[in-house]
C-alpha cells in the first residue's frame, strides 16, 4: 500500500512539475496583454492603447510596451536605465489618474539584451553604444510611422540619458525635445564626488569599518 501511495505521489508531482514548466514557457513566450488603461472610476478608457509588442530592430526581435489614453497624443520613447534594467513594472505602484499616458503616447522599450529583448544567442560584439543608438533610431522610425508623427520626444533615465544624448547628437531631426532624468554628464567625476562624500560621512559618524573599506 505504501509503495502504491509513493508511486501515486511521484506521478502527481511529475504532472504538477510538467504543468508548471508549461506555464513558465507560456509566460516567457506569450505576446501577453497589459491591463487596459482606466479612468479614476475604474472604467476602461475608450480608444486607449495598452499593449505588449515585438518588432525586428537591428537584426533581432525586440519587445516594447505602448500605453496611451489617446493615440493622437505626442509620442515619447522612454529609454530605461542600467544598462539592462527595464523600469515599467516599477512605475505601477505610483500611477495616478494624472499619469504621463494621459498627455503622451509612451513607448517603454526593452533595449537590446534586456527584458523582452533578451536572447541568449545575441552576439556580444553587437552590445555596443553605436548599435544601441542605431536600435533607438529604428524604434523611433517605427513610432513615427505608426502614429504619423514627424518628430517624437525622447526621454531617458540614468544610463538611458547617455544613450539619449548620443542618439539626438546623431539624429537631431527625429526629436522635438530630450528629457533627461538623473542625467549622466561625467560618470568618472560623479563617482569621485560620491566616493569623497561617503568617506567624509563615514569619518564624521566614526564608522571605522566603512572607513577601512573605503580607504583600501
Where do the language-model regions lie?
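Short amphipathic alpha-helix adjacent to the substrate-entry channel of hydrolases
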Residues: 90-107
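A catalytic-pocket lid/entrance helix-loop region that shapes and gates access to the active site
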Residues: 164, 173-216
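Gly/Ala-rich beta-loop-alpha elbow adjacent to hydrolase catalytic centers
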Residues: 156-160, 164
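A short loop-to-beta-strand scaffold at the N-terminal edge of the catalytic core in hydrolase folds
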Residues: 56-68
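Conserved acidic catalytic loop of the alpha/beta-hydrolase fold
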Residues: 131-151
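N-terminal type II signal-anchor transmembrane helix
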Residues: 3-35
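Short beta-strand element of the alpha/beta-hydrolase
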Residues: 73-82
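Glycine-rich "HGGG/HGxG" loop immediately N-terminal to the catalytic nucleophile
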Residues: 88, 111-127, 189
Amino acid at each position: 500500500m505504501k509503495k502504491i501511495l509513493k508511486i501515486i505521489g511521484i506521478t502527481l508531482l511529475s504532472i504538477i512539475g510538467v504543468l508548471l514548466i508549461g506555464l513558465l514557457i507560456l509566460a516567457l513566450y506569450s505576446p501577453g496583454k497589459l491591463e487596459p488603461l482606466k479612468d479614476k472610476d475604474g472604467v476602461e478608457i475608450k480608444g486607449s492603447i495598452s499593449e505588449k509588442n515585438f518588432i525586428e530592430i537591428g537584426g533581432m526581435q525586440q519587445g516594447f510596451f505602448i500605453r496611451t489614453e489617446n493615440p493622437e497624443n505626442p509620442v515619447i520613447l522612454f529609454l530605461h536605465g542600467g544598462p539592462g534594467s527595464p523600469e515599467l513594472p516599477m512605475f505601477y505602484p505610483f500611477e495616478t489618474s494624472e499619469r504621463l499616458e494621459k498627455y503622451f503616447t509612451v513607448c517603454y522599450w526593452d533595449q537590446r539584451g534586456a527584458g523582452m529583448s533578451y536572447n541568449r544567442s545575441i552576439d556580444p560584439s553587437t552590445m555596443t553604444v553605436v548599435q544601441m543608438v542605431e536600435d533607438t533610431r529604428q524604434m523611433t522610425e517605427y513610432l513615427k510611422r505608426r502614429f504619423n508623427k514627424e518628430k517624437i520626444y525622447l526621454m531617458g533615465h540614468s544610463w538611458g540619458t547617455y544613450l539619449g544624448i548620443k542618439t539626438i547628437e546623431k539624429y537631431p531631426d527625429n526629436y522635438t525635445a530630450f528629457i533627461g532624468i538623473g542625467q549622466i554628464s561625467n560618470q568618472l567625476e560623479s563617482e569621485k564626488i560620491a566616493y569623497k562624500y561617503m568617506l567624509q560621512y563615514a569619518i564624521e559618524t566614526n564608522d571605522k569599518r566603512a572607513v577601512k573599506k573605503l580607504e583600501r
